[in-house]
Amino acid sequence: MLLARRLLSVILLLTVGAAAACGHPQPKAPPPPEQAAPPAAPEPVAKPPDPYAAIDAAGQAITADFLRAQITTISSDELEGRGPTTTGDVATRAYLADQLKAMGYAPGDGASYEQPVELVGVKAAMPAKWTFHRGAKSIAMSWWDQYIAGSGVQTERGSIKNAEVVFVGYGIQAPEFGWDDFKGKDLKGKVLLMLNNDPDWDPSLFAGPTRLYYGRWTYKYESAARQGAAGAIIIHTTPSAGYPFQVVQTSWSGEQFGLPAAGEPRVQVRGWLTDDAAAKLVAIAGKDLSQLVESAHHKEFTPVPLGITTSFDFTNKINRGKSANVWGLLRGSDPTLSQELVVYSAHHDHLGIGKPDASGDKIYNGALDNASGCAQVLSIAKAFKALSPPPRRSILILFVAGEEQGLLGSLYYATHPSVPAGKIAADINFDGGDIWGKTRDITYVGKGKTTLDAPLEELAKRQGRIVKPDQFPDRGAFYRSDQFSFARVGVPGLYLHTGTDFVDRPAGWGREQIEAFEKTSYHQPSDQIRPDWNFDGMVDDVRLGFGVGVLVANANQLPGWTPGDEFEAARKKSLGQ
């Protein structure tokens, strides 16, 4: 039975195979269902380059070792204090030009690494006594201890003959504040005795405790000259000046430089009196200085003739020479925006050789002021060469002459720029720096004046720091360094200064260090580099300044002034608005 079943199975298999071989159709299996095509992989979205990553990477070129080495060289005795037109000045300029050339920067104007600046040096021989008379009374002020004066004219002789002394308060005309200390009085040929600073007790007048240009000594002498005065004397106090009388002594006793006179009004004598000497002077007129000062605190003030006369004769040794701004250009990558500049500035001059100190040192090396600024800008020049991608706008590295003499080099560049002022995006200026260590803050002199606040604050935040306004607003720092020359022609300026909140230091320590330096070393031979200088904070600050410049160089829009700022009109004029 089993055998029969097996035979039947074989027969069935053979029958099916034969049928297939004879071509009989077989049922087809249904086709598999159509599969949907797999979705295409999304195209990768190109991420824009992180500007902060590029800034951080290039910023590594800014180091403490480089800063120390540069300051050591630029403030060395071999450069003799870098006085304008001296051999030390020439050597300093050559050194800075060589540094820029070695880094691969082109000459600032395409031809030379120097922009010549004509200067007129005046070395005045002032009398040992300056005598004042009122009837039978007289008083003589002693040179150096009681009075300091410089020539206001670029001639071999200067003279004042029987000129009346008139107290003119602050010597300010400010129509925007409804303030006029002169009240239309005829002051031609007079000697104007005036207060330092500007009215600082009312925030609605001027800027309260923040000094404006009206409070600068340069404004005082310019204002007196516009009145036709023969001379001007500023009454010095440390609070009103922001520095002790010794700074006046060392800054004004040597050769004084200026740009060549161009027909502008000038006083014959630009003088200073200590407040004690001024009190004695007005006393011979029966006046109390404190009462005169109080009267000057009111808009209703009118000039006070003192009935005091003075004659003053002096001789000048005239030195017509040359210094120069040193400049180097890094061309931007954008065909259009490369026609615009971001400027980094620092002054290369100091006071040269002057009156010896107690140790006999007569070289005013200017290590902090301003070999440090030059070193910081050279560091930034290095960082821009390391930046990838390169900046869209061009970068101008500018070391200016004659800052200590009244911002002369920057004034010359601002009025003889390599591109029109409307094509200068910003000036980022370095004058002094942090030699005491890391801080939790950074001081921005001019905070609130421009749109540069935003990029600076973002970069500082990334460092874990905050941006503070000028911590010594009564000193008028914005009007005392080279960004002011740019501001006057409308260019937004950024002036960074050391913070005051130092890491691992008690509250108030930073202010103490800054004030101690200004008391003992500012404009003194003792401003020399020291082994204990700590550059960690300076590195942070320089990297901030570098980063702001990168963001400005790559932005589509130019930065501007805050609406209503005193320099907004100049910017609009430069832009043809």
Where are these regions (language model features)?
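Noncatalytic luminal/extracellular "stalk/propeptide" segments of secretory-pathway proteins
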Residues: 80-205, 306, 318, 323
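Catalytic-core environment of secreted peptidases
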Residues: 61-107, 131-133, 186, 190-212, ...
